[in-house]
């Protein structure tokens, strides 16, 4: 079977590709396990060449409907992992582009999967990387579960919510078998800060570990749901493999997360500095009203009990997540 990964040139997309190559097979629309014959990565840019002959790269935007349909193809034996998206900070500044990429692009993916379906009994599986930005409100609840009302306070969250609802309805109508993974903020991302309003979450670990001071645009007591990238990759694959009957009509599953503050990050960094004999940079207060305002509208805690009941993995302790980053990306 074929796998298509949108956002395949990004951090999570490239890691998912590597994980799938190691797994080697997935459940096909027939319900049987099939060997992964090829993986097609879609993205606007790719940082490095692929060395595995099973992997091809297509430079395109998901708003290009023809390119998306060409990549997905007409064979129902395809698994689609839809990770491509404009990030939260960009969406707030570029509303029309957010609609073009996140909504129009999402519909292109969904319609291509629908067109590839063989019968209503053998449907391509579509795994969508959604976000806890679907939640919000004037008053933030103590915790948000899969049953909580979605009231996003950002354009990014709005587009994710709409795509979740589309996946529910396309699945109800038997156009494809869709599942949405509602991701907490993923740490620790290697490289440089990006335009996401949550970029500080990785930065407050990544930069100090490299001996660099990190500007912090939010309050030090700000609580925020976070999980590790290894857990997210394992969860995306596990969600793909779940029997459809376990999901019912609600296809969006919120992944478990730790409630992390910059204060906790500072404590974890201090412990790791001692254990690994590292010179740690500082987390420096650099308060930004715009970023704090966005974060104020986000969930501070996630109830991931449904995901756990479905057998999806829980994240290891925050300290272990940071150690995984050091092991995987110490030279980055």
Tell where the protein language model's regions lie, with residue ranges.
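Mid/C-terminal beta-alpha module of Rossmann-like enzyme folds, strongest
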Residues: 208, 231-235, 239-291
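Active-site Tyr-X1-5-Lys
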Residues: 137-140, 151-179
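NAD(P)-dependent short-chain dehydrogenase/reductase
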Residues: 168-223, 229-234
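Amphipathic terminal alpha-helices
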Residues: 287, 299-309, 316-332
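NAD(P)H-binding glycine-rich loop region in Rossmannoid oxidoreductase-like domains
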Residues: 62-101
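N-terminal Rossmann NAD(P)H-binding glycine-rich loop of SDR-like oxidoreductase domains
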Residues: 2-26
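Rossmann-fold cofactor-recognition segment
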Residues: 49-64
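Conserved Rossmann-fold NAD(P)-dependent oxidoreductase catalytic core, especially the SDR/UDP-sugar
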Residues: 107-154
């Amino acid at each position: 079977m074929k796998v298509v990964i949108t956002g395949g040139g990004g951090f999570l997309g490239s890691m998912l590709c590597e994980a799938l190559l190691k797994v080697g097979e997935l459940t096909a629309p027939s319900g049987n396990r099939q060997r992964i014959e090829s993986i097609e990565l879609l993205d606007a840019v790719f940082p490095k060449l692929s060395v595995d002959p099973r992997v091809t790269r297509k430079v395109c935007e998901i708003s290009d409907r023809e390119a998306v349909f060409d990549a997905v193809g007409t064979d129902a034996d395809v698994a689609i992992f839809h990770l491509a998206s404009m990030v939260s900070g960009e969406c707030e500044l570029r509303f029309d582009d957010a609609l073009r990429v996140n909504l129009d692009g999402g519909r292109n993916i969904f319609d291509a999967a629908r067109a590839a379906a063989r019968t209503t009994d053998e449907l391509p599986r579509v795994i969508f990387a959604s976000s806890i930005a679907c939640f919000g409100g004037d008053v933030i609840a103590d915790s948000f579960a899969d049953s909580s009302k979605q009231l996003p306070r950002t354009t990014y969250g709005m587009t994710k919510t709409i795509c979740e609802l589309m996946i529910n309805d396309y699945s109800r109508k038997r156009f494809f078998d869709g599942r949405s993974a509602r991701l907490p903020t993923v740490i620790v991302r290697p490289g440089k800060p990006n335009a996401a309003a949550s970029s500080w979450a990785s930065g407050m670990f990544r930069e100090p570990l490299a001996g660099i001071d990190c500007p912090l645009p939010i309050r030090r007591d700000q609580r925020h749901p976070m999980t590790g990238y290894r857990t997210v990759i394992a969860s995306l694959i596990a969600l793909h493999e779940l029997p459809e009957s376990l999901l019912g009509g609600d296809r969006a599953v919120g992944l478990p997360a730790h409630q992390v503050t910059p204060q906790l990050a500072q404590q974890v960094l201090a412990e790791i500095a001692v254990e690994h004999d590292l010179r740690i940079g500082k987390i420096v207060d650099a308060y930004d009203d715009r970023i704090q305002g966005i974060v104020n509208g986000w969930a501070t805690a996630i109830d991931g009990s449904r995901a756990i009941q479905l057998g999806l993995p829980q994240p290891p302790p925050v300290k272990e997540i940071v150690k995984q980053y050091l092991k995987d990306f110490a030279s980055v």
